[in-house]
């Protein structure tokens, strides 16, 4: 009994990972996501490791999860992976109150974001660098 398995939304040479409710605004998170779009997986991990932005650690965890999904669930070659999509979306916005002068209050919005990273296996063979 039970319902049939859903069809795979991605192609056979892709894997993805999600992060929900990242405590950063979508605008700031998208700056980090732009760094890794189209880059090889190893190069993207190196960029995120040495990035000064706080949210780069969260993006790195999602990218590592996507790489692990590709390797373990879809049997893709890790050396041929690259970041095909890195999309950022809005999540909830917490509204808070900040006390101001003369008994007034100001609204403080604390933005949350969602992140989706899709890695794809390149069709061509990885380039072997000449060893000296």
From Swiss-Prot:
<comment type="similarity">
    <text>Belongs to the universal ribosomal protein uL22 family.</text>
</comment>
<dbReference type="InterPro" id="IPR047867">
    <property type="entry name" value="Ribosomal_uL22_bac/org-type"/>
</dbReference>
<dbReference type="GO" id="GO:0006412">
    <property type="term" value="P:translation"/>
</dbReference>
<keyword id="KW-0689">Ribosomal protein</keyword>
<dbReference type="InterPro" id="IPR036394">
    <property type="entry name" value="Ribosomal_uL22_sf"/>
</dbReference>
<keyword id="KW-0699">rRNA-binding</keyword>
<keyword id="KW-0694">RNA-binding</keyword>
<keyword id="KW-0687">Ribonucleoprotein</keyword>
<dbReference type="GO" id="GO:0022625">
    <property type="term" value="C:cytosolic large ribosomal subunit"/>
</dbReference>
<comment type="subunit">
    <text>Part of the 50S ribosomal subunit.</text>
</comment>
<dbReference type="GO" id="GO:0019843">
    <property type="term" value="F:rRNA binding"/>
</dbReference>
<comment type="function">
    <text>This protein binds specifically to 23S rRNA; its binding is stimulated by other ribosomal proteins, e.g. L4, L17, and L20. It is important during the early stages of 50S assembly. It makes multiple contacts with different domains of the 23S rRNA in the assembled 50S subunit and ribosome.</text>
</comment>
<dbReference type="InterPro" id="IPR005727">
    <property type="entry name" value="Ribosomal_uL22_bac/chlpt-type"/>
</dbReference>
<dbReference type="InterPro" id="IPR018260">
    <property type="entry name" value="Ribosomal_uL22_CS"/>
</dbReference>
<dbReference type="InterPro" id="IPR001063">
    <property type="entry name" value="Ribosomal_uL22"/>
</dbReference>
<comment type="function">
    <text>The globular domain of the protein is located near the polypeptide exit tunnel on the outside of the subunit, while an extended beta-hairpin is found that lines the wall of the exit tunnel in the center of the 70S ribosome.</text>
</comment>
<dbReference type="GO" id="GO:0003735">
    <property type="term" value="F:structural constituent of ribosome"/>
</dbReference>
<protein>
    <recommendedName>
        <fullName>Large ribosomal subunit protein uL22</fullName>
    </recommendedName>
</protein>
<dbReference type="Pfam" id="PF00237">
    <property type="entry name" value="Ribosomal_L22"/>
</dbReference>
């Amino acid at each position: 009994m039970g319902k049939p398995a859903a069809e795979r939304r991605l192609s056979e040479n892709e894997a993805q990972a999600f992060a929900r409710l990242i405590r950063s605004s979508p605008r700031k998170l998208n700056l980090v996501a732009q760094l890794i779009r189209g880059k090889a997986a190893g190069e993207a991990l190196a960029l995120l490791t040495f990035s000064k932005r706080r949210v780069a650690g969260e993006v790195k965890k999602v990218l590592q999860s996507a790489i692990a999904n590709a390797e373990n669930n879809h049997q893709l070659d890790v050396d041929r992976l690259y970041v095909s999509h890195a999309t950022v979306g809005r999540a909830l916005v917490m509204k808070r109150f900040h006390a101001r002068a003369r008994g007034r209050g100001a609204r403080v919005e604390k933005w949350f974001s969602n992140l989706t990273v899709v890695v794809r296996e390149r069709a061509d063979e990885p380039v072997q660098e000449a060893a000296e």
